[in-house]
């Protein structure tokens, strides 16, 4: 919490250091990333900040992955975007910054900062950098995306035999056998393949690519490769599983809604999961569900996991003082 608060305060000070003697209003919009979707936790950080800077008022709006993108788009069109927004590089850098809506944060990216981040994960620096070489995101946290199963149901269906419980991995064949065991034991729906929106696409994408060692892009990240032979084979396998009644395609839901259906006990696994979801859903979990995180199934049982990085970016709202800061 202390580290997150310090990083958050540094961004606020970027916005306010030229107007320190006057009252300043800052708007912050945040997607539900860990405790940043928890108003009580955010209020604690703001209280700590205001104890030092009582002249700076921060107004927070909490977005979700169902309507958040539309709210940002509407705000951009109406020129009412917030000062600060918290999300990941796929939105901050690849979307809004590429459209010229964000402020460069190069002043925050000192040699010391870059060295510190590289010491933890060398890929993070590049994800925060736009094609023009400027930095548009300041990272706060990262985690690996995975899936999760209801261990209670798997044990009742004798499906845990298809899982390496020590490494939390399974093969594509083991995944199929586990689905069949669940259905035969009366646990249906097993898993839900969703696609109503962008939210949670990291889950279904990783499911498809891992099944037969496919890739989402080429090594240079200049070309999407979802139409590769390996990925077509993965999509075909999922269609076969659906035709057999072992898994369900539901085009009406997104990743957040899939999580909700898992948490309330409707389905027995979720493909859109990470460590933050444990905290987000601990008070919503239906009785009898035992969470057991899993890597995505792969042909040889050795998965490739994608990491998620989240942080802050600043919208360019045309305020000369804020731009100068």
Task: List each language-model region with its residue ranges.
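Hinge/lid segment of periplasmic solute-binding proteins
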Residues: 88-146, 173, 203, 207-209, ...
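Helix-loop-helix "hinge/cap" segment bordering the ligand-binding cleft or interdomain interface
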Residues: 51, 109-113, 126-199, 214-252, ...
């Amino acid at each position: 919490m202390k580290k997150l608060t310090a990083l958050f305060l540094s961004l606020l000070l970027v916005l306010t250091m030229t107007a320190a003697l006057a009252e300043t209003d800052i708007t912050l919009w945040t997607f539900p990333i860990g405790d940043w979707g928890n108003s009580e936790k955010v209020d604690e950080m703001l209280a700590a900040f205001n104890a030092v800077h009582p002249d700076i008022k921060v107004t927070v709006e909490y977005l979700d992955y169902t309507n958040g993108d539309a709210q940002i788009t509407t705000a951009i069109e109406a020129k009412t975007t917030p000062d600060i927004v918290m999300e990941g590089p796929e939105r901050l850098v690849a979307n809004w910054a590429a459209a010229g809506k964000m402020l460069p944060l190069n002043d925050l990216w000192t040699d010391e900062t870059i060295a510190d981040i590289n010491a933890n994960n060398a890929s993070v620096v590049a994800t925060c950098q736009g094609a023009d070489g400027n930095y548009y995101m300041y990272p706060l946290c990262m985690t690996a995306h995975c899936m999760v199963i209801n261990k209670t149901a798997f044990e009742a269906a004798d499906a845990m035999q298809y899982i390496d419980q020590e490494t939390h991995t399974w093969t594509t064949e083991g995944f199929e056998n586990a689905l069949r065991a669940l259905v035969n034991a009366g646990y249906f729906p097993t898993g839900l393949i969703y696609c109503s929106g962008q939210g949670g696409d990291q889950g279904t994408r990783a499911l498809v690519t891992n099944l037969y060692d496919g890739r989402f892009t080429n090594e240079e990240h200049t070309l999407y490769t979802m139409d590769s032979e390996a990925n077509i084979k993965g999509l075909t396998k999922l269609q076969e599983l659906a035709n057999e009644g072992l898994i369900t395609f539901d085009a009406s839901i997104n990743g957040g809604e899939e999580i909700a259906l898992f948490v309330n006990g409707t389905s027995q696994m979720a493909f859109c999961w990470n460590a933050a979801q444990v905290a987000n859903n601990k008070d919503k979990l239906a009785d009898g569900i035992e969470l057991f995180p899993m890597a995505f199934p792969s042909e040889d049982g050795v998965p490739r996991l994608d990491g998620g990085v989240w942080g802050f970016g600043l919208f360019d709202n045309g305020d000369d003082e804020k731009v100068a800061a």
